[in-house]
Amino acid sequence: MSSPEAVRTVHVYSMHTDPFAQPGSGDAGGMNVYIAQSVRAMLTINPQLKVEVFTLNRTPQAPERAHVEDPEWGSRLVRHYIDVPAAREATKNDLAEYLEDFAQSCVTQAMNVPDVVHAHYWLSGWAAVQADGVWSRRLFPGRVPDGADGSGSSDGSGEHRLSTRAVAIFFTPHTTAAAKDARRGPGEPTEPRIRHSIENRLPAFVDGYIVNTPLEAEELVQSHPSLSGRISIITPGVDTDIFRPLPGVHPDHDTSETRCRIVFAGRPQPLKGPHLLVEALALLPRDLQVELDIIGRSESDYEQRLLERAAELGLADQVRLKDPVPPEELARIFRSADIVACPSSSETFGLVALEAQACGAAVLASDVDGLRFAVENHRTGLLVAPRTAERWAVAIERLVRAPYLRHSLGANAAARARSMSWESTARKTLDVYETAVPVPRPAET
């Protein structure tokens, strides 16, 4: 493969979540935005490209048809909704039980044989390996040895699969079990054993990894030396047509040194940390009037527990829970916020932080992995460590009492975001696809 046009068909696997679902609800978040935006940008760059996206049909809102053409891109972007009835009520961590069914359906429902499969998250990564075994048996009968589809043993080098593969596989983890467990905070569950097992095996079966930051790449190579030279670092982008400052539009309490509205946007769950913000508000000096808007839903009892805790702390009138909103409305909320807070225990990048900065918002974020790259400390936002309510209270008070600092951080952040586009992300991703060794195909295919 020597030019972007050499890759004609890409299959994107996102087993556990629909990339085109509303971010901030259920399992939909930054990964969904990343996939949807990069796919659309790739289609713009390469007019010959066709993309098929595969996801489980897990919600009542999913189309009843097995596949739908995208309203904007038509047959160039087809969304496949794989129906595995038993998986509809399963939690994300229980979906591994249905990997084989999902992988088989990805092959049987495909409209074209892919040149590349790009799998997102550990479930999809293993589904891609299993699907490659199905493609291999279909395209090259009798040629697939034990272990080529992940079913047997491997020495970790990947030589078995790479010598017999039917398609090139690229994998973006978005998170890893090892990283999440190492950074998890109090009350956050450990990752399931099967996830650790699969993520330890994946390096032997994929052509390459695509990650967001140098830290992510470094940690992967430390855990899996065989990945050295097979990891590409591609920074996510931001849609600055939507997420941008507007002339004459200012935060709600633009010049106040005592009043402030904080916005948290994302799925409310322990690892995202909105509970830290509730606890921090209770520690602020009494002369400060600080409100917190939590934008998102997690389909659990976590939100109710947040509201109950706020009431216990006397903050019932200061903490509000709101439904997730479309990008245009989210951008409006960011522009009106005095502070946007991202108190996660771990993020591979932190798209919410980047989108908020693109709107000119002052951002507070945990000083952890990917957020260190999304936010330039003391220039486009402030990083908070350690990840405690006490430290977050100190950081919030600092920004509330310094409107000039909020203005400076927001201006620098908006300027930086203008240089980070999804077009750049997509172009680099297409270049990585081209590094795969082409697979000779039988003449009849």
Question: What is each stretch, according to the model?
Answer:
Residues 362-365, 375:
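Short hydrophobic beta-strand element within catalytic cores of glycosyltransferases
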Residues 291-307:
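Glycosyltransferase donor-sugar binding loop
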Residues 324-325, 332-337:
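Short alpha-helical donor nucleotide-sugar binding micro-motif in glycosyltransferases
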Residues 345:
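Aromatic "clamp/platform" in nucleotide-sugar-dependent glycosyltransferases that forms part
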